[in-house]
Amino acid sequence: MTIKIAVIGFGNIAKAIITPLLEKNLISPEDIYCLVNSKESLENIKKNFKYNVNIFQADSKESNLIWDCQVKLLSVKPQQLKEISELDNHKKNENLLVSILAGVSLDKLIQKFPNHRCVRVVTNIPITVGKGLTGISWGEDISEDQKQFTKKLFKNSSKIYEFTEDYLDTFLALTSSGPAIIALIIEALSDGGLSGGLQKKLSEELVMEMILGTITLIKQNNISTTDLRNMVTSPGGTTISALRVLENKNLRSALIESIVSASNRSKEFR
């Protein structure tokens, strides 16, 4: 049986999820039904998205077609949830609804879409380059086929982890807020190189290559971060001098607290 997918909100993350499936012919463009909020968005997608998917404005008559799709990928802004739920035709069909809305709990999804089987997903911005991390929490009565199809949506653009919902907030803090934290660290280290006389562009390149090389070394040699730190830290040397400054400035504690704070903030959005 052909499965039709409704994509409700067609931003960068939704495109990153759908595009690999189209590229690998795992789904056909005619089986994708996209719902957008404005004529501008509709025209932009028609002009710039290379696949000829079905696309409708939310206020058009044709938009009702999305509610008959077996799978809905919900990727609007969280504040649009009420508006979208009011468009639902409320047919009892037990179709699959996969939400990537930040901070919207399974309970709220089930409340807004009682005739669907709901799944809450957290993913992150590197999914747009095929390097995402995706956490999945299953709602009630999800069939095995629906679980497998949900994983199919994400496995071509990200690594998948399954959690009970209690852990999704921490997963979100680490993986979704994490890229901004890493970007800040890259900026700060690059500014350190700038202070030492390096050109900004070169300093940024060196920092990013250093981080990539460090991660590769840890993963390929299967060593711990402590092992690596000890490998490059000599008595009285430059590295221990740098680490001493960071410990005195409580960098470790600040990073831990940043994740705890982001996780707590995610819980407040539920």
Describe each PLM feature range.
Residues 10-11:
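Glycine-rich Rossmann-fold phosphate-binding loop(s) that bind the pyrophosphate
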Residues 14-15:
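N-terminal Rossmann-fold NAD(P) dinucleotide-binding loop
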Residues 21:
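Aromatic pocket-lining residues of Rossmann-like dinucleotide-binding sites
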Residues 33, 39-42, 48-136:
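Rossmann-like NAD(P)(H) cofactor-binding subdomain of soluble oxidoreductases
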Residues 108-117, 133-171, 181-220, 265:
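Internal alpha-helical scaffold of NAD(P)-dependent oxidoreductase catalytic cores
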Residues 208-270:
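NAD(P)-dependent Rossmann-like dehydrogenase/reductase catalytic/cofactor-binding core
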